[in-house]
From Swiss-Prot:
The gene is trmB. It comes from the Bacteria. Belongs to the class I-like SAM-binding methyltransferase superfamily. TrmB family. GO terms for cellular component: tRNA methyltransferase complex. This is tRNA (guanine-N(7)-)-methyltransferase. GO terms for biological process: RNA (guanine-N7)-methylation; tRNA methylation. Catalyzes the formation of N(7)-methylguanine at position 46 (m7G46) in tRNA. Residues 1-17 have a biased composition (Basic and acidic residues). It catalyses: guanosine(46) in tRNA + S-adenosyl-L-methionine = N(7)-methylguanosine(46) in tRNA + S-adenosyl-L-homocysteine.
Length: 236
């Protein structure tokens, strides 16, 4: 798998950039999973997408969900095991994260996950219209410096891209412990006629939704006293 070195100050506004492509050196078995298991699960978006995203999976899924930037994969793996007839697409450009989800897929014999190691914006453009029931973005890179805000995933263009692929009634769910990025996300979604924030009272965004699997990063943030917001937006 090739790496692309990126200049964080370069204006690359068409790219939804998450962060580093590779971190710690992979252990031998992790490298073997990247070499031998990933090719069987990786989506190839060079060709035309299927007319129905459920057909990405074999057997065909009852519906399809996407997790963007799944990190260590704890949430993605748990959701796939809890909803066995749903197909899950995990998007993660960080090689170490990809190795971690592959290990969980192997250990749990999980058959309903497909993976994409590239740019989420390209994946969203490839997927059929109204093909997803849900998109999750959990603890994304907040890019705290003002000059890097253009690299945050939540932008007007990505909101429009998500609106295109979500079914009416589908949801975009966002979890973040950085207040500024939460406010950024709320303000950007408020500008879109395609989404409605579902919170009716404070606990609706202060507490995880039912069945939420806490990630390793989420537990670390809680230990350090950072409170996350759990935002849900319905495609209208």
């Amino acid at each position: 798998m090739s790496e692309r070195k990126s200049d964080p100050d370069r204006d690359d506004s068409e790219r939804a950039f998450f962060g580093r492509r590779k971190g710690h050196k992979l252990r031998q078995h992790q490298a073997e999973l990247i070499d031998h298991l990933l090719p069987h699960l990786a989506l190839d978006i060079a060709g035309e997408a299927p007319g129905n995203a459920c057909e990405i999976f074999d057997p065909a899924a009852s519906d399809v969900r996407l997790e963007i930037g799944f990190g260590g994969g704890e949430h993605l793996a748990a959701e796939a095991q809890n909803f066995a007839t749903t197909g899950f697409i995990g998007c993660e450009p960080y090689v170490n994260g990809m190795a971690k989800i592959l290990a969980q897929i192997e250990a749990g014999n999980i058959a309903n996950i497909r993976l994409f190691a590239g740019d989420a914006a390209e994946l969203l453009a490839w997927l059929p219209k109204a093909s997803l029931s849900r998109i999750d973005l959990i603890h994304p890179d907040p890019w705290p410096k003002r000059r890097h805000w253009k690299r945050r995933f939540v932008q007007d263009r990505t909101i429009a891209a998500m609106a295109r692929v979500l079914k009416v009634g589908g949801e975009f769910r966002f979890v973040c412990d950085i207040d500024d990025y939460c406010a950024w996300t709320l303000s950007h979604l408020a500008r879109s006629a395609d989404f409605k924030w579902l919170a009716e009272r404070a606990d609706d965004f202060r507490q995880p939704w039912d069945g939420y699997t806490m990630t390793r990063y989420g537990r670390k943030a809680a230990r350090e006293g950072r409170k996350a917001a759990y935002l849900r937006f319905r495609r209208s």
